[in-house]
Amino acid sequence: MNPFPLDISRIYLEPAVEEYARGREILLRFPAAERIPVASHWRIPELQDADPGDYLLAKKQALVLGVKKGLTFRPNGRSADFIAPSSSNGCAMACAYCYVARRKGHANPISTFVNIEAIGAATARHVARQGRKMVPNQVDPQAWVYDLGENGDLSVDAGISGNVRDLVALFRNLPHAKGSFATKWVNPDLLGYEPQGRTRIRMSLMPPDLARLLDIRTSPVAERIAAIPELHRAGYEIHLNFSPVVLRQGWEAEWGALFTELDDVLPAAVKDQLAAEIIMLTHNRELHEVNLLWHPKAEELLWRPDIQEEKVSESGGVNLRYRTGWKGQWLRRFKDLLASHMPYCRVRYAF
């Protein structure tokens, strides 16, 4: 198993952090780390403007502690019914295609929010206002599903503080709701959280050779697959996240091999409740330029103007996605390939 991806040597903290029990707990967990006061977790110039050559070092050594200000819920309809206020953002990993790094400077190490009680209370109130889910949808037929980790990986966050354990415990006692998060990291600590079926883990997977190039600092794909039965026995609902689907010569053969491995490893109990989401690659010009400075090999696969087209995002950024018409054909082929190897795996959504 890969070693834990953090070796915290400096902690940037907002003024109010030590007023919270969770803040004091985290500081005690990393007693040797240098403490650097900052006015806001959003504005740390030495992280935002750092040399891309230090990209991985900042992710490994830096931790930001702050107080979550906006406790808002956004409708989703894809991975979840709602995006919950996050207990963190940023990530210790460095997946070459990841959009998270566009939001807060390219390094974007983990920022952990210490006001977890307020985040949990706001979530419980929001769930109570929804009442029972009367109309089934692709997200879940009965429960309102809340994405808890839109901008990070909660399996890694669980090695920093008790925030993830607290959120799993919260949803254990919310009869009309489930928590959900995607992960590329295997953390055995999650096995002791007793989710009782009220937290859905979406295990992110791609062919191993592709992951070695693109999923930097993550758990190997074989370890992620091996962890699925254990997580299910521990009480988690397990779905699969095939994301991003990156097209290259021989993609059908390598994805077919992945589906065969899953079919061989997963027990019947997992297959009976399995569903998947499929997300075709979308890349970003700004991230492309950063990647060229630290991981140009990845850009040979991610930046493909010959089969991609530009799309301007709502925020004004220039994205590249697979060309209209072609993308639909490739997506159909992907779904057909999945169905031929894993006919029991329902596709919740694909785009």
Ranges and model annotations:
Residues 1-23, 263-351:
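Auxiliary Fe-S-binding modules of radical SAM enzymes
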Residues 224-288, 337:
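Conserved C-terminal portion of the radical SAM core fold
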Residues 10, 143-147, 178-180, 198-202, ...:
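Structural preference for beta-strand elements that scaffold enzyme active sites
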Residues 95-98, 203, 240-243:
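Conserved, mostly hydrophobic/aromatic
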Residues 148-155, 186-190, 199-218, 244-249, ...:
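Conserved radical SAM core fold
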Residues 64-79, 100-202:
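Conserved Radical SAM active-site core
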Residues 1-81:
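Flexible, acidic/Gly-rich N-terminal and inter-domain linker regions that tether
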Residues 86-103:
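Local cysteine-cluster metal-coordination motifs and their immediate loop/turn environment
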